[in-house]
Amino acid sequence: MSGVQLSSLSTLNYRNLAPGTLHFPAGVTGVFGENGAGKTNLLEAAYLALTGLTDVTRLEQLIQSGEREAYVRADVQQGGSLSIQEVGLGRGRRHLKVDGVRAKTGDLPRGSAVWIRPEDSELVFGPPAGRRAYLDALLSRLSARYGQQLARYERTVAQRNAALKAGEDWAMHVWDDALVKLGTDIMLFRRRALTRLDELAREANAQLGSRKPLTLTLSESTTPETYAHDLAARRAEELSRGATVTGPHRDDLILTLGELPASEYASRGEGRTVALALRCAELELLAEKFGEKPVLLIDDFTAELDPGRRGFLLDLAASVPQAIVTGTERAPGAALTLRAHAGRFTEESRPATVGVGA
């Protein structure tokens, strides 16, 4: 299967990265250096430029101290054509362009990158909100309609919560009708998508050497069949709390390892393996949907992993058309190796046809 390729990445005033352009070959690019050298920021910038997505709470966090704006640009080969994707950051907003034309996040290729990082363990051990966010982000990339319905649902929940806080019991039937329609769509889409996601995650978990089978299920606070009834039944509680307590915004993605919930009983190593399995499933699901392998971004390939699982990650990187792998050690077998230091990247080795500037 062919894949998306990040031909080059340019940054200006982005975190601690020095301004400049990096050119990437097909295959594996290894980036090594001490912690704080800019390796993670490089992957974050690449992911932002490829997808338009970031999980920071304030965009100002991405802009270098003392600067008002930042900029990232990716030259992307996909589907046999080259596109230029630009993201400008400033005044609390993102400004996207594709080939010089203003765009929205949904206009960028939705299956262009997958980012594996040590923090993924929080998908296993963290609160339900993190697992919901993972699932919703993935499904929004698989289906633009899902993302649109989710945004409408979240706006409706916020408006209903405002009415609950104001004690507007008389208005609840209006909000309830909208909530049931949107929430039912979300629940049904999640159920359909989870069937394949569960299969792929189970396969990846086994390939990673886990002896305990992994199962993904949804813990739902209501069902499409009972949603309207459940909202009415908890009306008094919701008016008292000033919040909507029933619906897909309260659901959880349950990760079961063997017969026990991984969030409570998995070891740190097992949790890291489960998180890797989720990202591998994400990679395959996006490839199945869009017909091309995403660019694979792997942050700190040695973190919390034994040699066998490190080997799996490196084999995974070698199996896709393009990957960028960071670590405190050199990634073996890389087509291009870059040393990171203070936000700058210098070539250790590269194919003769590839130029990299920093």
UniProtKB/Swiss-Prot annotation:
Sites where the protein binds ATP: 33-40
Entries under InterPro entries matching the protein: DNA-binding_RecF, DNA-binding_RecF_CS, P-loop_NTPase, RecF/RecN/SMC_N, RecF_2
Disulfide bonds: none
Protein location: Cytoplasm
Domain of life: Bacteria
Primary location class: cytoplasm
GO biological process: DNA replication; DNA synthesis involved in DNA repair; double-strand break repair; SOS response
Annotated keywords: ATP-binding, Cytoplasm, DNA damage, DNA repair, DNA replication, DNA-binding, Nucleotide-binding, SOS response
Coiled-coil region(s): none
GO cellular component labels: cytoplasm
PROSITE patterns given in the database record: RECF_1, RECF_2
A GO MF term: ATP binding
Function statement: The RecF protein is involved in DNA metabolism; it is required for DNA replication and normal SOS inducibility. RecF binds preferentially to single-stranded, linear DNA. It also seems to bind ATP.
Family membership noted in the UniProt record: Belongs to the RecF family.
Name of the featured protein: DNA replication and repair protein RecF
Organism: Deinococcus geothermalis (strain DSM 11300 / CIP 105573 / AG-3a)
Encoding gene per record: recF
